[in-house]
Amino acid sequence: MHQSKEERVHRVFEKISAHYDRMNSVISFRRHLKWREDVMRRMNVQKGKRALDVCCGTADWAIALAEAVGPEGEVYGLDFSENMLKVGEQKVKARGLGNVKLIHGNAMQLPFPDNSFDYVTIGFGLRNVPDYMTVLKEMHRVTKPGGMTVCLETSQPTLFGFRQLYYFYFRFIMPLFGKLLAKSYEEYSWLQESAREFPGRDELAEMFREAGFVDVEVKPYTFGVAAMHLGYKR
């Protein structure tokens, strides 16, 4: 039976939720932590503000945002995988954070009014949605005027030689890690497919502009295997 992209992605994340954090560290050689630290530094999140992390998964970025805005601020994390949210809830509870709420929802139809958040983020989630532009426009809609939306995502390396090595690693090695460490070869095969098909830096920057963002900034990481895109709402 043919599955839609949304159905397939949901099945993938429901299955790998218990191993997701560990596998992220293995696959990226823990570089994803440094990438997000740099993005947070560039965002310069202010105390008392409101933030939304779309496709929050196990809530790492939502937690970082909650710590940054402080107890006077408010953070929502949204994901469509109940199992990923359960892992995230455990992490939020362990840190004693009372200013972050994790909710089950769909990035294609964010359950928030227009102009709700000072910061809207999505980390390693945009490549998994059915329609990139729909989600970017939804993120733009709920961002306050003057606020920012930030995407941290895999990208397409441009350095010759390294690009070929990257594609080999993602296509053949990463699924093996999934099989050995998480018993999930098929699921990690999907993740490499979604990364391979995702737009490059320039194309995604143009999509940000088409969605309504201005002053779009792009920062590549580790020879372009990942990139930050940051845009503001007028």
Curated annotation (Swiss-Prot):
Highest taxon above the source species: Bacteria
Positions annotated to bind S-adenosyl-L-methionine: T58, D79, N106, A107
InterPro entries: MenG_heptapren (IPR014122), SAM-dependent_MTases_sf (IPR029063), UbiE/COQ5_MeTrFase (IPR004033), UbiE/COQ5_MeTrFase_CS (IPR023576)
GO process annotations (BP): menaquinone biosynthetic process; methylation
Functional summary from the UniProt entry: Methyltransferase required for the conversion of demethylmenaquinol (DMKH2) to menaquinol (MKH2).
UniProt-listed PANTHER family: 2-METHOXY-6-POLYPRENYL-1,4-BENZOQUINOL METHYLASE, MITOCHONDRIAL, METHYLTRANSFERASE
Protein name: Demethylmenaquinone methyltransferase
Organism the protein comes from: Geobacillus kaustophilus (strain HTA426)
